[in-house]
A protein has these predicted regions:
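Glycine/proline-enriched, intrinsically flexible loops and inter-domain linkers
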Residues: 1-410
Length: 410
């Protein structure tokens, strides 16, 4: 009904794939957005700019701190190492998209009972290894976090990763665009990994679909960080966005909507890892380590030179228009033509909610039946994975790389 009301024609296959990605729970927050809007978003030190994917705080003396947190639960439940690692990469690029350097990582993890659940132990071991591998390779310290275990997380895991960035206020990317500006895709090549990942992350976990989990490459991410910061200093970037959930579909539509512009994109110009990718796969691939940049044509030579210096790929995939439309082409063939705000603002769902009945049956003060001595109870508590030292976890993280860490884990 929402589509019929706003488009009034039959959608193409590419348009359907784009909407499926952008309107997934993972990308649109269609169930939670109304609740998230209740949280405060303004304050004396909060800097609000169009298109930012991280919170920006003015900390004085001309400097800012950027903060971003997100979950990567579904991918981590299927492929814990890759799922956790790409979660780290995603939050780092969201920090970078504001024009700040990522300087620290945190994580919050939840698993099943690792004392008697082999699958929970497997998830725990590989999620921690994935976070450690990605952060350590990038040279960004993981300086804090938390880990808890409970049977309610059986066969699943909660993997929240946060990143903090730092930079000069004067060097923040002030997202803007003018008709005729060029749209660039820089970083890793586009492949089949992560195709349909946002829809997959919004579904019930009923089976293993490892192809929907993205492949991490922290070495390319490190090169992207340095290239982006150099391009920022050279004033080559008008606007920038990370390619995360939904891939190009979401990055293009959300950038166009937030800036009030139109974007024309030719999928033939996207650099590929696999030459036989279909246009639909190109649009919804969630291959990692990719950034969307809008630049003035006069800056193309400079930004290309910077990318060549750091040996990362750079492709001109489109241009900015003033019609506020998302136009996807393959050569001269139109594959999708939709209003950018229609794509980016998916319909919201007001789900029914009620207080769980079992809560009323719980005693307010449960009677303790344990007759063990207090010393034995204390020893059992200290042996619990929830209370015991997390040394095994944080010793895998390089929390001193960069020699800026003052308060260390543990």
């Amino acid at each position: 009904l929402h589509i019929k009301k706003n488009v009034k024609r039959k959608l193409t296959d590419t348009e359907l794939q784009i909407l499926a990605a952008e309107w997934s729970e993972h990308c649109s927050y269609k169930s939670s957005k109304q609740h998230l809007k209740m949280l405060p978003t303004t304050g004396p030190n909060v800097i609000v700019e169009k298109g930012y994917d991280s919170g920006v705080l003015d900390v004085g003396d001309g400097y800012v701190v950027t903060v971003h947190i997100e979950s990567h639960n579904h991918p981590s439940a299927v492929e814990p190492f890759g799922g956790a690692a790409t979660g780290v990469g995603g939050v780092i690029r969201d920090i970078l998209s504001a024009g700040t350097r990522p300087i620290a990582l945190f994580d919050g993890l939840r698993f099943g009972n690792i004392e008697n659940d082999v699958h929970a132990r497997w998830l725990f071991k590989n999620v921690v290894a994935g976070i450690a591998n990605y952060g350590n390779c990038l040279g960004i310290p993981t300086i804090g976090g938390e880990v808890e275990f409970d049977t309610c997380y059986k066969n699943y895991a909660l993997v929240d990763v946060a990143a903090v960035g730092f930079g000069k206020k004067s060097k923040l990317i002030k997202n803007h665009a003018n008709p005729g500006d060029l749209v660039l895709l820089i970083g890793g090549a586009t492949g089949r990994d992560g195709v349909g990942g946002s829809q997959f992350a919004s579904d019930m976990l009923e089976g293993e679909d490892r192809s929907a989990v993205q492949i991490p490459d922290p070495f390319i991410e490190k090169l992207i960080i340095e290239a982006i910061l150099e391009a920022r200093d050279a004033k080559c970037i008008n606007a920038m966005k990370d390619l995360g959930g939904g891939g190009l579909s979401c990055a293009i539509s959300e950038t166009a909507e937030s800036l009030g512009i139109g974007i024309e994109l030719d999928v033939k110009n996207v650099h590929l890892r696999e030459s036989d990718l279909s246009p639909d796969e190109i649009m919804i691939s969630e291959s990692q380590e990719r950034m969307l940049i809008i630049t003035n044509p006069t800056k193309l030579s400079k930004i290309t030179q910077i990318c060549e210096k750091f040996r990362i790929q750079c492709s001109v995939i489109g241009k900015v228009k003033k019609d506020k439309m998302m136009h996807v082409k393959k050569g001269k063939e139109t594959l999708a033509l939709l209003p950018a705000d229609f794509v980016a603002r998916g319909p919201l769902i007001d789900r029914k909610k009620s207080k769980p009945k079992y809560l009323s049956k719980l005693p307010s003060s449960p009677k303790l039946k344990n007759k063990k001595s207090l010393s034995n109870v204390l020893l059992e508590l200290l042996a619990s994975p929830n209370i015991a030292s997390k040394h095994w976890v944080f010793r895998q993280y390089d929390h001193e790389v960069g020699i800026r860490t003052v308060i260390k884990p543990g």
